[in-house]
Regions:
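Conserved catalytic cores of phosphodiester-cleaving nucleases, focusing on short active-site segments
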Residues: 434, 458-473, 487
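Extended alpha-helical scaffold and adjacent linker segments that couple domains
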Residues: 394, 398, 406, 461-464, ...
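Mg2+/Mn2+-dependent nuclease catalytic core
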Residues: 170-174, 473-491
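Nucleic-acid nuclease catalytic cores
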Residues: 477-481, 490-512
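Structural motif
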Residues: 149, 465-467, 500
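Active-site metal-binding core of divalent-cation-utilizing nuclease and nuclease-like domains
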Residues: 140-144, 437-463
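Phosphate-binding site recognition
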Residues: 1-426, 441
């Protein structure tokens, strides 16, 4: 008899549906109980698709007194009294891509659903959303005799898409500030407030007025509140990993290593254990294939716009040092720096910490993020991710087949096809493109490889050859070859067998 197939909660973000439907669930309810028992106001920042909505839903069920759902879970064991509180749960991810009028209406609709439930229609003007919100909470408390709970999931979602458009941002921000403003004055009526998001918008009343709002985003004991740890993977997902290993024709231990290499590596404070991206991990185990699942859902538009407006040195993203802790929480409104946003959105994570000056080193968390992000950056030069991906595959194959001339012809064609409006003809521009191309070739390729007296642009290894590349802009191939010899770039690879030096010149005029 075939074993019962595991139900993976793909697209399922509500706690009750997961528990009642018998879906795979990693128990995080101990965190929920501890936070509810310790704080009154909590804020958590995590990247998209990292489990924030499921955690919000878990808080909802916990405070709604749905005891049966927690049977056999940590919170069910710890909690003694299951008081039913009126819960106001606002999912702001449904309020994206709107203008001011649409945002006002959808917030009003969210309130009206609760007003019907609690009989809070007091004749307040429909567009007076803050007064309606305040009256609603008070009515629920009066009707039940229990303090209320407010859960705001993805609180910043309505603002993210207009973040780079100040003309639209200012009125939208005012609407959201107005909506959130009653929370402080409602303190006597509130048992608990839980807020999630990606960024920390400084000019919203949530952060300026709620002085007792506890930001747990970088607190070590809550580093694994979202996502999946190695111990959780090996304890609760052993059979899915075995199934993946069988499907891929590798050992169980090799499957674990591949999962770690592709989807692990997130750190939300210094000294924390590695955290897996739960979305990609579960998608991989369900499909039994290693894929770029997080990137299939798309890179946020606001991030791409910010990167175009404020370009970064892509060659240094894998090791950004001397980042202060205050940079992690900096509001996107108050800085043009893209780096904090890359951390907040999950494209970079903490890789190191210096205790002396309290600075952090950031880098890509894993292979999925690194390759997906580099592909996206390369696509910015070609205005088409599909064309860029196809080129990298062909270029990779030519090198593996030791067809250097063919690979250079492909590179020439790729460079010539870059739209003029994306090309600035500086040497740094071409260096960046070369870096992106070679970084995407795979594990056997290294970029900017140091030797004793210099740094080679790229080193590529095939089964029987090692290629050392040097590129010049508006110079000559002969100059590049002389630099390889003069700087001793090939010396470390002589013992590996057949070494080939490749000097390439790029003309900024013809881009060939």
């Amino acid at each position: 008899m075939e074993a019962k197939r595991i139900r993976y909660p793909i697209g399922v973000q509500t706690f009750d549906k997961i528990i009642e439907g018998g879906y795979l669930y990693i128990d995080k309810t101990g965190y929920v109980h501890e936070l509810a028992d310790t704080y009154n106001y909590v804020f958590l920042s995590r990247p998209r698709r990292f489990g924030k909505s499921l955690l919000s839903s878990t808080f909802h069920s916990y405070f709604a007194g749905e005891k049966d759902l927690f049977e056999g879970l940590e919170a069910g064991r710890l909690r003694k009294e299951w008081t039913r509180h009126p819960v106001f749960h606002f999912d702001m991810s449904t309020a994206k891509h709107l203008n001011g009028g649409q945002l006002q209406r959808i917030l009003g609709y969210k309130l009206s659903e609760y007003e019907k439930k609690w009989g809070a229609d007091s004749g307040i003007a429909e567009d007076d959303i803050n007064a309606r919100f305040e009256r609603l909470v008070k009515a629920a408390v009066e009707n039940t005799g229990e303090k209320a709970v407010i859960i705001i999931d993805e609180y910043d979602a309505p603002l993210l898409d207009v973040m780079n458009d100040r003309e639209r941002l200012v009125p939208m921000r005012q609407i959201m500030r107005n909506f959130y403003s009653p929370i402080k004055s409602l303190d006597p009526y509130l048992r608990f407030v839980f807020i999630t998001g990606i960024n920390k918008f400084a000019q919203l009343s949530i952060f300026s007025e709620l002085n007792n709002l506890q930001n747990i985003s970088m607190m070590p004991r809550y580093s694994a509140i979202c996502g999946i740890t190695q111990s959780e993977l090996e304890k609760d997902m052993k059979e899915p990993v075995r199934d993946l290993a069988d499907s891929q024709g590798v050992s169980y231990d090799n499957a674990l290593q591949l999962l770690k290499h592709n989807y692990d590596g997130y750190h939300f404070c210094h000294g924390s254990e590695d955290i897996y991206n739960p979305f990609s991990l579960i998608k991989c185990l369900d499909a039994r294939e290693f894929g770029s699942y997080w990137f299939e859902t798309g890179t946020p538009t606001f991030l791409l716009e910010r990167l175009r407006k404020n370009p970064m040195d892509e060659t240094k993203l894998d090791k950004m040092t001397e980042i202060a802790q205050s940079d992690f929480d900096i509001s996107p409104e108050l800085t043009e720096d893209t780096l904090p946003m890359l951390y907040q959105t999950g494209y970079l994570t903490i890789k190191g910490y210096n205790k002396e000056d309290h600075s952090y080193t950031l880098g890509y968390p894993n292979r999925e993020v690194r390759e997906g992000f580099l592909r996206g950056l390369l696509a910015n030069y070609k205005s088409s991710e599909g064309m860029s991906a196809s080129f990298v595959l062909k270029f990779n194959k030519a090198l593996k087949d030791n067809d250097v001339n063919g690979s250079l012809e492909l590179l020439q064609s790729f460079m010539a096809g870059i739209p003029y409006d994306l090309e600035n003809k500086t040497e740094k521009h071409y260096q960046t493109i070369i870096y992106l191309v070679f970084s995407l070739l795979g594990y056997y390729t290294q970029t900017e490889v140091k030797s004793a007296v210099g740094r080679a642009d790229a080193v590529c290894r095939t089964k029987d050859r090692t290629y050392v590349f040097e590129f010049k802009v508006d110079g000559s191939a002969e100059e590049a070859l002389k630099q390889i010899d003069g700087k001793g770039y090939m010396i470390p690879y002589k013992k590996e067998g057949r070494c080939v030096k490749v000097g390439v010149n790029i003309s900024s005029a013809t881009r060939t």
